[in-house]
Amino acid sequence: MRIVIDGMGGDKAPEEIIKGAVSALDSYEDIELIITGIEKHLNRELNKYNFPEDRVKIIPASEIISMNESPSKALRKKKDSSIVKGINLVKEDKATAFISAGNTGAVMAGGLFLLGRLPSIKRPAIATVFPSRNGGTLVIDAGANVDSKPENLNQFAIMGQIYSKHVLGVKNPRVGLLSIGEEQAKGNQLTKGAFSLLDEDKRIINFVGNVEGRDIFNGSCDVVVCDGFVGNVVLKTTEGAASYIFDLIKDTFNKNILTKLSGLMIKPFLKKQMALVDYRQYGGAPLLGVNGVVIISHGSSNSTAIKNAIKVAKETVNKNVVGLIKQEINKDGE
């Protein structure tokens, strides 16, 4: 399996990208990596490690799409960027998946315009795993579409159900629609319209109705469906809240010598619990609905996140998620 990585994408590129890539080579013997980016910078980092050189190839890219660039303009103007060259390798069947911690909008636009949508898919969506009591809840869409229609949410549910079942290993995923109350009458025009479609669609086997924001974390459902505007707000709010809580805990244990000693005693336990809500453990989020495997990683990804993103890409390819979505979306939901 050949996976291509954007070597210049993210706040910690290329150092952490290369470190994570080399670590993945040790863990997954069935993968080969193509790394796109500025050759001298990539080679400088690769020279720090021992690795099987026959399993790594650099594809030079002279341009970088920065985080604050307009995605559409950057794609048009920067044809020799690490993102464009990487996605084109998937398009040309020279790689099976693409991973980037770079400009999310550019990666989404590249996936959509270079790879294209799957037949019958109206909008692609980002599927992000949130920590929960049952191990993880998939939220879809987490930011690809700020405006959606009920039929879009219906398709998001089908794609999320497939990913949850085949990649996350949930036997019979419970699908919930994010709203402001559990009752069917609650919500806005979008959620009310989506509820009717989800409730009637036989392709969605286990629709549990409306769910609230707290249900993402309490384990009462496995897939939470929403539009990308709401999903991204939930994502950023969760990240901010987690960071704030960690800071509060730190401040509490740093107050005096007694609290510091208490902190040292429970540090191993806290470390273990904090790892459960660390985005790095989840690696990256697939852009579902495009004609290829595209994994979007957090802009602050370190080597652990990149290694886990490679794992996500590998499993998404192995489970034939793209093929399953193509097959399921064309079935009659009546």
Curated annotation (Swiss-Prot):
GO MF annotations, alphabetized: phosphate:acyl-[acyl carrier protein] acyltransferase activity
Q: Which GO terms describe its biological process?
A: fatty acid biosynthetic process; phospholipid biosynthetic process
Alphabetic keyword roster: Cytoplasm, Lipid biosynthesis, Lipid metabolism, Phospholipid biosynthesis, Phospholipid metabolism, Transferase
Q: Which domain of life is it from?
A: Bacteria
Q: What InterPro entries does the database record attribute to this sequence?
A: FA_synthesis, Phospholipid_synth_PlsX-like
Which NCBIfam families does this one have? plsX
Protein name, as recorded: Phosphate acyltransferase
Q: What is the protein's species of origin?
A: Halothermothrix orenii (strain H 168 / OCM 544 / DSM 9562)
